Amino acid sequence: MALFRKKDKYIRITPNNSLKGSVSHNVPEVPDELFAKCPACKHMIYKKDLGLAKICPTCSYNFRISAQERLTLTVDEGSFQELFTSIETKDPLRFPGYQEKLQKAKETTGLHEAVLTGKAMVKGQQIALAIMDSHFIMASMGTVVGEKITRLFELAIEENLPVVIFTASGGARMQEGIMSLMQMAKVSAAVKRHSNAGLFYLTILTDPTTGGVTASFAMGGDIILAEPQSLVGFAGRRVIETTVRENLPDDFQKAEFLQDHGFVDAIVKRTELRDKIAHLVAFHGGGQ
């Protein structure tokens, strides 16, 4: 018997490249916008299961929603009258890339700034309404945001209206420097004048409400509500831990933590906010 012998030749199969196209057509494609991943429980959710309120059916997490979606959930159909749309955002510091960022945010959200302001009816109650949209440069507060909210309070004083604001913000808009920081004082002064007139001011804290907005008008309401698990604070968690050199509780800066410590009056489910707003406005004199 031969010690060495040639290996048997195997049959070689050459791939038929012409079949590649036909194979790919048989592979089903899943649309990118069909599912959403819950940031809280990490489950993949069929978007239609979120409903109009955008609430996770597994853990009840409240997804961040746009100003227009919030408007649809809150006010009486056809009652919203948008105001102060002619105020244009400037670039006082000629900050590099700021104009491009603004333009992109406008195209993405359909808004001309980070807050939607106007008058509306909620179950028959007339209110002055502001809704901040975190999809617009994280709803950072610049000169236009501050001016629109200030004018809303001034209009409310003239027309004897309660003010309802849904807050959401990453803080002051750094691209406008000190001009953005002064909006904190300007809006707070308008809130005080509205209060002096004996009118009702309701704030609803949504995720996230931070920075200069928290330090000014967000916490100035006669009654402060919050959506479940909303992040609410001034400085960031890591900044605080570094400063005080202590580990903070896991639920620190969550709406429930603030309620436990007296900073929030009530946590209200998103689906119940419309009824709650109408009830509180009517109880405090109404807006008819």
From Swiss-Prot:
Compartments, record wording: Cytoplasm
InterPro entries: AcCoA_carboxyl_beta, Acetyl_CoA_COase_Trfase_b_su, ClpP/crotonase-like_dom_sf, COA_CT_N
Swiss-Prot/TrEMBL keywords: ATP-binding, Cytoplasm, Fatty acid biosynthesis, Fatty acid metabolism, Lipid biosynthesis, Lipid metabolism, Metal-binding, Nucleotide-binding, Transferase, Zinc, Zinc-finger
SUPFAM superfamilies linked: ClpP/crotonase
Annotated EC: 2.1.3.15
Main location group: cytoplasm
GO MF: acetyl-CoA carboxylase activity; ATP binding; carboxyl- or carbamoyltransferase activity; zinc ion binding
Annotated Pfam families: Carboxyl_trans (PF01039)
Catalytic activity: N(6)-carboxybiotinyl-L-lysyl-[protein] + acetyl-CoA = N(6)-biotinyl-L-lysyl-[protein] + malonyl-CoA
Cofactor binding note from Swiss-Prot or TrEMBL: Binds 1 zinc ion per subunit.
GO cellular component, one term: acetyl-CoA carboxylase complex
Pathway(s) of this molecule: Lipid metabolism; malonyl-CoA biosynthesis; malonyl-CoA from acetyl-CoA: step 1/1
All residue ranges annotated as the CoA carboxyltransferase N-terminal domain in the record: 34-288
NCBIfam families: accD
Biological function: Component of the acetyl coenzyme A carboxylase (ACC) complex. Biotin carboxylase (BC) catalyzes the carboxylation of biotin on its carrier protein (BCCP) and then the CO(2) group is transferred by the transcarboxylase to acetyl-CoA to form malonyl-CoA.
Subunit: Acetyl-CoA carboxylase is a heterohexamer composed of biotin carboxyl carrier protein (AccB), biotin carboxylase (AccC) and two subunits each of ACCase subunit alpha (AccA) and ACCase subunit beta (AccD).
Record protein name field: Acetyl-coenzyme A carboxylase carboxyl transferase subunit beta
Organism of this sequence: Streptococcus pyogenes serotype M28 (strain MGAS6180)
Gene that specifies this protein: accD
